[in-house]
Amino acid sequence: MGLSSPTLILAATVSLLGGIVFGYELGIISGALLVLKTVYQLTCFEQEALVSAVLFGALLASLIGGIIIDRWGRRTAILASNLVVLAGSIILIATSTFWWLIVGRVTIGFAISISSMACCIYVSEIVRPHQRGMLVSLYETGITVGILISYAMNYFLSGVNESWKYMFGLAIVPAAFQFISILFLPSKPHKLNFWEQDTDDGFIELEETGEAGEFKPDTYDRQYTFLDLFRSKDNMRTRTLLGLGLVLFQQFTGQPNVLYYASTIFQSVGFQSNSSAVLASVGLGVVKVASTLIAICFADKAGRRILLLAGCIVMTIAITGIGIVSFTVKMDSHRDCGSVTGRNMSSGESNVSQLLGIVHAETSTINTLDNSVHQLAMAIRSPSLANSASSNHKDLISQNSTVLPASPELPSNYTILNWITLLSMMAFVSAFSIGFGPMTWIVLSEIYPADIRGRAFAFCNSFNWAANLLITLTFLDVIASIGLSWTFLLYGVVGLLAIAFIYFFIPETKGQSLEEIDKQFSTKRILQKRETSKGVGKRPSSGPPYQRIGKASPS
């Protein structure tokens, strides 16, 4: 094993705790909002602003976070993000005004976005090639666990006086543990991949004996500017296009909006009592956790490319199935948001409410349970999670029902179609959790040179957030233009394009060091790389594998 067991455990802990903080912060607002909207007499617009504040903070972090990560280091960025989580939590606990709540949530969003990028990059650099996929995927598991913990806290603290302060404050606990854990890990982990890759010597021991300064690989001699991402130097333009393709297809396959209709689908198959809704949410949570565990187990065995392809194929089939079935199973796509106060909203506020609202259930109890369904379903990579969390919380601020409940008198074939829809949605969630969810971020943490990896990762991440916003804010217009069924079918077409993109352009990176991956991208074209990816898993005992590839494809 490349890393000593304590170091490996610490690396896994850092990845897991980072995901827990991310998931908890996105999920906890659902319970807190139930109290806050009464305490502060919030309008719909104010509730939506409070929920969306995390999203805007995260988007801001994705724009400037790469500079922080590359200039001050991955570990420093993670440590700083924990301190920012602490600051944001204190603001939320101590505040007595609505606008300070906004400031606190924006601060939290900024922190968890920085942490998510830095964690994925840091862990990918500190572990051996055969461990990288598993440990980076642990971040996804942490997100799922964090959301489940937030749901439990929402339940247990619901009757406590000023419960929202405790809800926000508990985020300090996992952040503090992550802060302590990472103090025992090296500050410059990328050197680990250069040293004695087939022995048990790790970076920490080499740094202590001074051996790390005797050799500096030329990969880290190279300096890059941000503009190099768009130039042909070392095939950087190709790498950028690959990263952008992955994050854009991750969003444009419709993943956020499909899950906005989870409550409608559950109601259409008869989950209308409290116990049934809880069962549905638990079932979806089990599917999510199981799928994430599958991704962890097979990321370094089956490989990133295989899981991306398999996940995207299942997603395409599932979303197409939902589209076809929804021609028969009527689901009301109307969105509404009712204010808890008597204050009038401006037309602008009303428009924002319509754009950001989702399908609502009939009672506040069902709203809360549907909210948990969304949270469990959306335990995925950073931007996707943030937007889904927004949808969850907006369930809570609804007062009017627009769901068409299933009737017990419906014919059996109609019931079968409802269940097909439900199973298709679960398959979609599962496939995303195995493929696009974790694999996108593993690949992004691998394909860029170390000197610009943070900025490149953040650049792609900003497009992910932007695409997530775009697809959400245009969803109503698309439905109004072509209908809900055709919207889902359109996502299916995008899924087909994503399959082609992955098949023809995404290489396999399992089993390779980050330096070998960088060399391959620097010395040959992407199509050549894909053709040779079948032999990637077994590296020669000496000498870099790209030499053999170069002989096969002389330029």
Curated annotation (Swiss-Prot):
Keywords on record:
Cytoplasm, Glycoprotein, Membrane, Sugar transport, Transmembrane, Transmembrane helix, Transport
Could you name the domain of life of the organism this protein comes from?
Eukaryota
Which residues point to the Cytoplasmic side? 1-15, 70-82, 127-132, 187-240, 299-305, 437-464, 507-555
Q: Where is the signal peptide?
A: none
Record: residues binding D-glucose: Q250, Q251, W441
Where is it mainly found?
Answer: membrane
Q: TM segments? A: 16-36, 49-69, 83-103, 106-126, 133-153, 166-186, 241-261, 278-298, 306-326, 416-436, 465-483, 486-506
Task: Please give the Gene Ontology molecular function terms for this protein.
Answer: transmembrane transporter activity
What glycosylation sites does the entry record?
A: N161, N274, N344, N351, N400, N413
Q: Which Pfam families match?
A: Sugar_tr
Record localization: Endomembrane system; Cytoplasm, Perinuclear region
Look up the record and report any one GO term of the cellular component aspect. Answer: endomembrane system
Keyword Iron assigned: no
Write out the similarity annotation: Belongs to the major facilitator superfamily. Sugar transporter (TC 2.A.1.1) family. Glucose transporter subfamily.
Functionally, this protein is described as follows: Facilitative glucose transporter required for the development of the cardiovascular system.
Protein name (record) = Solute carrier family 2, facilitated glucose transporter member 10
In its UniProt entry, the species of origin is given as Xenopus tropicalis
The gene it comes from is: slc2a10
